[in-house]
Design a protein with these regions (language model features):
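Short, solvent-exposed loop/turn positions at domain surfaces
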Residues: 10-12, 35, 71-72, 96, ...
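Basic, amphipathic alpha-helical recognition segments used for DNA target recognition
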Residues: 20-25, 56, 60, 99-100, ...
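DNA target-recognition patches
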Residues: 22-25, 35-69, 224-230, 234-239
């Protein structure tokens, strides 16, 4: 039995309690300040998150690719340690935002209610939201534009675990995340090296120049001499 199993057996002898999303979090939609107001987008101090931020910088974010001025904010920025969940367009993405911020309208903010603030580790909630991502994909409204059924969204269940268990889970997942990142970085370096190797040999093999000890006997031909050339067909009646 693992340490986690021991903790659950010890601290949750009657099983794990679950609470709906709507009980644990306040939710608000993100928004985009008016592009017509240039002062909203100049000398910005408030991070404004988009899907590009997650794709570029990962799922735990403390800065954005774009900032807006405080004048662009409706009320106050959303609080630090909120979670943004993609509930329209690209479904199945989320991030933990560790600074006060806003995000565009593709996201719904999950802001933990005061009475639960000391009961949850933000990183545990971040990791558990990977299950929420999958749930969202199964709760879509019917229509041409992908969006999550927010009534069903509000009913998603979060476990109410003792903080000791949450931190144990976070520690294990942090370790796996770190190992995975190192492997990915190593593979990316290997890929770059192999690409350079490929380009070197490709250029070498396709360069017919004077070699040490002699020459290569070759002749150049115009493309039109060795190939028939035609353009593609734009006939829309063809399959």
């Amino acid at each position: 039995m693992s340490k986690l199993d021991d903790l659950i057996q010890k601290l949750c002898p009657d099983g794990v309690e679950y609470k709906p999303l709507s009980e644990i979090f306040n939710t608000r939609n993100g928004y985009t300040p008016s592009k017509k107001e240039k002062n909203f987008w100049e000398n910005g101090t408030v991070p404004w998150f988009r899907m590009e931020d997650i794709r570029e910088n990962g799922g735990i974010l403390d800065h954005a690719m774009q900032y807006v001025s405080i004048n662009a904010i409706k009320g106050d920025p959303f609080p630090a340690n909120s979670i943004i969940v993609a509930t329209s367009a690209t479904i199945g993405e989320h991030a933990l935002i560790t600074v006060p911020s806003i995000a565009n309208q593709r996201f719904t903010y999950l802001m933990i209610k005061n009475q639960y603030r000391n009961e949850y580790d933000p990183k545990f909630l971040y990791y558990y939201c990977f299950k929420l991502d999958e749930y969202c994909k199964e709760c879509l409204n019917q229509g041409n534009f992908a969006s999550v059924d927010m009534k069903k969204f509000s009913k998603f269940q979060f476990p109410r675990l003792p903080m000791e268990i949450q931190r144990e889970i976070v520690g294990v997942l942090d370790n796996y995340t770190e190992v995975t990142a190192k492997i990915k970085a190593s593979l990316e370096k290997e890929l770059v090296a192999r690409q350079k190797q490929y380009e070197f040999y490709r250029d070498k093999l396709l360069t017919f120049d004077v070699l040490r000890g002699g020459t290569i006997d070759f002749r150049w031909r115009m493309l039109c001499e060795i190939a028939d050339i035609s353009t593609g067909n734009s006939n829309t009646n063809e399959a």
